[in-house]
Amino acid sequence: KCDILIGLSGCALLSAKKAKSRYHALFFCDRGCRHILSQDDILNSIPSARQVYRKDIKIELEQYGMADYIILPSLHTKESFIQEGEKVEKLFVNPYGVNLEMFHPLPLESDGYDIIFVGNWSLQKGVDILVDACLKSGLSLLHVGAIVDFAFPEQNDRFHHIDPVNQPELIHFYSKAKILCLPSRQDGFGLVLFQAMVCGLPLVYSHYTGGPDLKKLVDDHEFLFEMPEYTVDSLSDTLLKALKKAEQQPRNSIRNYLTPNAVSNISWQAYGQRYNEFLLKIATEK
């Protein structure tokens, strides 16, 4: 018997139909990013970016319609569903977490870069304006991840690229940078925000990431910097503010601005607890 089926969006259509017809189960559609139509609009505005597959749109929309609840990782993803006409009562936001055994506070290496960007080097993640902002302000950048749909400026010695590494190896690279930047045009959350924050790096991010959610989970917001506008100038100014804050961190010692309460709020255990409480509440009402 199945009381509740949790299925990833785009992957659970047939399972959801069977669970609802055979067991009268509730279907929770777990969507890791913005509404598919919003995501499609964003990518359509960047012709050279990887686009949404047309067949995926139909499947996603059918799942949204079937779902009793839609599980989302961030406030901006919730906003996108509301903008597409979804009922607020159907949406549950549960921010992701971080492996606290894998990531922990670190000192900054003496020859560190100004900025680290971790993840796919893609237009969807805003790397084009990140490059322009770095060039404008003369900042150095370390990238760890795959090159996707935007050329990496390898001819400039201020930029350094590392191919994708296994997640446990990332902590080594976080020690090489003063701040992390994630200027995505749309990113469901961006787990690298959690990772870098736990390692002690100030964060710069766009509204279209999980950055705004972090302000609800941690006590000290002084090291969290959201771009006021999605422009090169705004990003450049925000990067400089974050770097100024990074200069105030202790030299040659551990960087750590999170309280024990904040650390507990951003763990995977906390994510599971929030999810479990929601499931129990719904199961009781069913």
Give the residues covered by each predicted segment.
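Acceptor-binding helix/loop patch of EC 2.4 sugar-transfer enzymes
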Residues: 25-58
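Short hydrophobic beta-strand element within catalytic cores of glycosyltransferases
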Residues: 202-207
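Short alpha-helical donor nucleotide-sugar binding micro-motif in glycosyltransferases
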Residues: 64, 172-177
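Nucleotide-activated donor-binding/catalytic signature segment of Leloir-type glycosyltransferases, i.e.
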Residues: 150-171
